[in-house]
Amino acid sequence: MSNIKISPSILSADFSKLGNEIQSLEKAGADLIHIDVMDGHFVPNITIGPEVISKLRKHTALPFDVHLMISPVHKYIKDFADAGADIITIHPEAVSYTHLTLPTICSV
């Protein structure tokens, strides 16, 4: 049996039906749900924030892998953790002090 985990991104999903899209991924065998968060600053696109993630929580018990493509990332770690992120992925170049940011993620 493989140890590979399948974590499909919802970035290309129909945002008007995100709950249904996530349930479809779960039925298809996804192990996690990958959620790309973009702020229009660190990257040019804007996607979703903690409020949407908290609403999506009711649609699945699968872990959420929340990929924060935002700056400053440290200001929002707790918000995304509280919203339902199980895994938080950051870009080291988005933080000034990685040695402080990583313990912050571990503490939430």
Model-derived features: positions:
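Alpha-helical and His/Cys-centered functional microenvironments
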Residues: S71, V95, P103
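Conserved N-terminal beta1-alpha1 strand-loop-helix module at the mouth
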Residues: M1-K78, D82
